Amino acid sequence: RYAFTILREQPMWQKLITQSFADEQDALNIVIETINTKINRGENLLSLLKNGFMLQGRRIRLAAFKPKMTLDDDDADHLYKKNIFSVVRQMKYSTQGFDKDNELDLCILLNGLPIITLELKNEATGQTVVNAMHQYQTNRHPQNRMLRTCLVHFAMDNNRVMMTTQLAGDNTRFLPFNKETVNPQVEGDYPTCYMWKRGAAS
């Protein structure tokens, strides 16, 4: 439902429904179908979030970015404040195929659209970031639509963070996302706590 809150904040939305569709659900179905079609054709989610897309001659905006001059653009600032970030734990992302009933440790969504996934490991239980990377490489099908849609995937443990923007099975390439070559120790917290603090601050 979060995916469409921002649509309802746009003046064109009700006009679009009235002029071109039977009801709001009919319009939403076409929006979802259009997003899926564009992703399947290789369009990047970031491009869709930034630019939206045209539907029946009207631009559909899926997200709003912070305007540079809020005093000069009240409408843009209002829409920006209607963005909704949500975090889902142990999210099942597929009901069929290779990924059936698989769960992601964390998924972050913007207006209902998945943008970030995280696989988390605890070194105290014998699992490390290496296990998280292996999980992405061997237990996450790279052609799964939801996974392909996401902008970035993080593998992390108590001390290290690795990231990739494209899953490719065994060929998935991960890059470090640490503060330094080795994350510094943090008194009373884990060395990777910056991931959570940075996210909360954003």
List each model region and its residues:
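An alpha-helical interface "stripe"
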Residues: 1-202
